[in-house]
């Protein structure tokens, strides 16, 4: 329930902010809202705006959605090891020390998030800390630090923004063509019905184009995972990273959602690899082994 409320409130706030930004842009640039240029600006504002606002709020959302307890002062040996390990890896990767946190979950997983390389969060599940060896956990942390060092959060946000923009744009263009084709007259009843049909068509096309576009986003995500694995192998050692992946392959399916899933150590399985945010573990191990 808490996650649902956060989702609804956040999306409402995003819509309000983007609506204000859109009106300002139309006024300043003098763009006709009903023109193709106006439609493209509308789609770009909501396509990129939603992605970037989500990125800016990602740390805040992650902490509240998953109940991440940021370690301000280590209280035990495990927390001390966790903080010191991330600090060492961040130094070697050339980034500022991320915030480090733990969230309560029996699954073995971790994620990184944050709007900038020097303003990030690395969070691990309690299940990972208690189920993995120190060497395996070190490799997982190195994987997340590599995501931060590689700037993966911003990269995928840009890709998602481009995809969102064109999904919205082409859905409305195609819906307009279909609506014009089937409209027979311009009386009030037809206009009202046509407007409703247009909105339904836009919704259906956005769903369809969104599914197709997600293939592109997921492909980029899988490439970033291979790169993060390679970075982890440099920071923690190839054998440790392979051992961590082998341990993950024997664990339960992860429960992270949305952008947290994209930057977790392990992703959900899918009927098709095209829609997976992470490559199959056997492929990741094979890539590390060369």
Curated annotation (Swiss-Prot):
It is a multi-pass membrane protein. The active site is at 144. CDD domains: M48B_HtpX_like (cd07335). The chain crosses the membrane at residues 6-26, 36-56, 158-178, 200-220. Zn(2+) binds at residues 143, 147, 225. Its cofactor is Zn(2+). GO terms for cellular component: plasma membrane. It comes from the Bacteria. It is an enzyme of class 3 (hydrolase). InterPro entries: HtpX_protease, Pept_M48_protease_HtpX, Peptidase_M48. It is found in: Cell inner membrane. Keywords: Cell inner membrane, Cell membrane, Hydrolase, Membrane, Metal-binding, Metalloprotease, Protease, Transmembrane, Transmembrane helix, Zinc. Binds 1 zinc ion per subunit. Its EC number is 3.4.24.-. GO terms for biological process: proteolysis. One of its GO terms (molecular function) is metalloendopeptidase activity. Belongs to the peptidase M48B family. This is Protease HtpX. It comes from Aeromonas hydrophila subsp. hydrophila (strain ATCC 7966 / DSM 30187 / BCRC 13018 / CCUG 14551 / JCM 1027 / KCTC 2358 / NCIMB 9240 / NCTC 8049). The lineage of its organism: Bacteria, Pseudomonadati, Pseudomonadota, Gammaproteobacteria, Aeromonadales. The gene is htpX.
């Amino acid at each position: 329930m808490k996650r649902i409320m956060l989702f609804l409130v956040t999306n409402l706030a995003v819509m309000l902010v983007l609506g204000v930004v859109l009106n300002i842009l139309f006024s300043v640039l003098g763009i006709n809202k009903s023109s193709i240029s106006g439609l493209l600006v509308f789609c770009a504002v909501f396509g990129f705006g939603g992605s970037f606002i989500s990125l800016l709020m990602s740390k805040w959302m992650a902490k509240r959605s998953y109940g991440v307890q940021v370690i301000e002062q280590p209280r035990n040996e495990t927390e001390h090891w966790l903080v010191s390990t991330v600090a060492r890896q961040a130094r070697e990767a050339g980034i500022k020390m991320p915030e480090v946190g733990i969230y309560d979950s029996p699954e073995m997983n971790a994620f990184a998030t944050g709007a900038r390389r020097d303003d990030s969060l690395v969070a691990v599940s309690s299940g990972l800390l208690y189920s993995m060896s120190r060497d395996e956990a070190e490799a997982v942390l190195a994987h997340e630090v590599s995501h931060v060092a590689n700037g993966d959060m911003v990269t995928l946000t840009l890709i998602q923004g481009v995809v969102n923009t064109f999904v919205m744009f082409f859905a409305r263009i195609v819906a307009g063509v279909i609506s014009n084709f089937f409209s027979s007259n311009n009386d009030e009843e037809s206009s009202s019905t046509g407007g409703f049909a247009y909105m339904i068509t836009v919704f259906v096309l956005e769903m369809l184009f969104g599914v197709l576009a997600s293939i592109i986003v997921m492909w980029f995500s899988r490439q970033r995972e291979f790169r993060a694995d390679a970075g982890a192998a440099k920071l923690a050692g190839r054998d440790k990273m392979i051992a961590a992946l082998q341990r993950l392959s024997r664990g339960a399916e992860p429960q992270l959602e949305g952008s947290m899933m994209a930057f977790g150590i392990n992703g959900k399985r899918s009927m098709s690899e095209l829609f997976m945010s992470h490559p199959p573990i056997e492929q990741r191990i094979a890539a590390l082994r060369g």
